[in-house]
Regions:
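Pre-Walker A adenine-sensing motif
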Residues: 1-13
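Hydrophobic anchor at the beta1->P-loop junction of P-loop NTPases
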Residues: 21
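Conserved lysine of the Walker
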Residues: 29-30
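Short glycine-rich substrate-engagement loop in P-loop NTPases that contacts/grips substrate
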Residues: 43-73
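Structural recognition of the conserved hydrophobic beta-strand(s) that form the central parallel beta-sheet
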Residues: 75, 99-105
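Short regulatory helix/loop adjacent to the ATP-binding pocket of P-loop NTPases
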Residues: 108-123, 139
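Accessory nucleic acid-recognition modules appended to NTPase machines
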Residues: 158-320, 327
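Domain-level recognition of nuclease-like catalytic cores that cleave nucleotide substrates
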Residues: 357-384
């Protein structure tokens, strides 16, 4: 079940600027670049002969492009495989006013090697897995189970888990082991499951360290690896001063719900179960994160949790919108406690609860939005 989707990410800045396009493996970077920049000079560093040639002599890139027109646009796919090329790219940008689109799946590889990151001469963009607005006839249940990486979402049922298993295996082998990012691959593998168990919850480094038999410093380093290899991200707590004391620890989410489903063995989830609820929240956060990044508000997401246990899953901006995600067939007053408490602190906030309700309604100033309708409103810019 293969299909190409029109991606929402805006790369039009490439008409005037250079771009770093980061994204996890199989998010569709190569397909996107080939579609958006058809006809441009293209270096695919996954091709062995191209990679070997430029690894042996990085200055050959400059020599080849000296013959190109000033200001020409050049695409280099998987730049982290030959980071030494960035010195040549820098020279070509400053001397020949050339523009580059540089893709990569690991910012960590560039940081670790202390390579030239172009001194702010390239804009940073991030490609996420597919989002609902990019898929005709979006299937919520399929997305909850298979995730939104193109090869997984469009996979047949009898192949999808093999592909997800292979994806995690390749990540461990090529991103972690081959790059010697960790000394103990077994401990890191154990950590991945511990991170999956706490995905969407406040991060407790001490508990994870104890569960994995490693120290807290190592746990923090492992989370940093997940972030810099695009496999996960932290959502900070909302810290605007108010009456109630709130927790400060961030929440962690894997970049795609399929990773958590695989690590925890969630193959067939039924509505009404805790695991279905966790996957539902994860998918909704995944969509919100992508929307905020693509719309230029990448740092606008936080969550709110008081010491008394009241919480809101997503706070947008400076408290402008508060959103709770509940995979229930019909929202009840008990599901609104966190939002109402947030409203007591920040009365100007727009309150939204996203659920499996069949129709939208307004309950005590809280918008009850069916999940698919919420996603449509989100991507039309009607939520934030």
């Amino acid at each position: 079940m293969a299909k190409e989707c029109s991606r929402i990410i805006d790369l039009s800045d490439a008409s005037t600027d250079s771009i770093f396009l980061f994204g996890a493996r199989q998010t569709g970077k190569t397909t996107l670049l080939l579609n958006k920049f058809a006809g441009c000079r293209y270096y695919d560093l996954l091709e062995n002969n191209v990679r070997r040639r430029l690894l042996t002599n990085p200055s050959q890139l400059r020599e080849e492009l000296l013959l190109a027109a000033d200001g020409e646009l050049v695409v280099i796919d998987e730049i982290q495989l030959v980071p030494e090329l960035l010195d040549e790219v820098h020279w070509l940008i400053t001397r020949k006013k050339m523009r580059f689109v540089l893709s990569g799946s690991s910012a960590r590889k560039l940081k670790r090697k202390g390579v030239n990151t172009l001194g702010g001469r390239a804009l940073l963009k991030r490609l996420f897995p597919l989002v609902s607005a990019e898929i005709d006839d979006f299937d919520l249940n399929r997305a909850l189970h298979y995730g939104m990486l193109p090869p997984h979402y469009f996979s047949s049922q009898n192949m999808v888990w093999k592909r997800i298993e292979a994806y995690v295996g390749v990540y461990l082998k090529e991103e972690i082991k081959a790059e010697a990012l960790v000394r103990n691959l077994s401990a890191f593998n154990h950590f991945l499951r511990a991170a999956a168990l706490t995905s969407g919850e406040m991060v407790n480094y001490s508990n994870i360290a104890q569960d994995c038999g490693i120290d807290v410093k190592t746990v923090k380093e492992y989370f940093s690896i997940l972030d810099e290899t695009m496999i996960g991200y932290m959502v900070p707590s909302f810290r605007k001063v108010a009456k109630r004391r709130v927790t400060q620890a961030p929440r962690f989410y894997f970049f795609d719900v399929s990773i958590v489903n695989f690590l925890l063995g969630r193959r067939s989830m039924q509505p009404g179960t805790a695991e279905y609820g966790h996957a539902f929240e994860h998918l909704m956060i995944q969509e919100v994160v992508a929307y905020l990044s693509y719309s230029g508000h990448a740092d606008a997401l936080s969550y709110w949790h008081t010491y008394s246990g009241l919480e809101v899953d997503a706070v947008l901006g400076d408290g402008a919108v508060a959103i709770e995600f509940k995979a229930v067939a019909q929202v009840q007053p008990k599901h609104l406690k966190g939002l109402k408490a947030f409203s007591d602190e920040f009365p100007q906030a727009r309150l939204v609860i996203v659920s499996l309700d069949s129709v939208a309604r307004l309950v005590n100033n809280v918008e009850v939005r069916p999940a698919v309708e919420f996603l449509r409103l989100l991507w039309s810019g009607s939520i934030f």
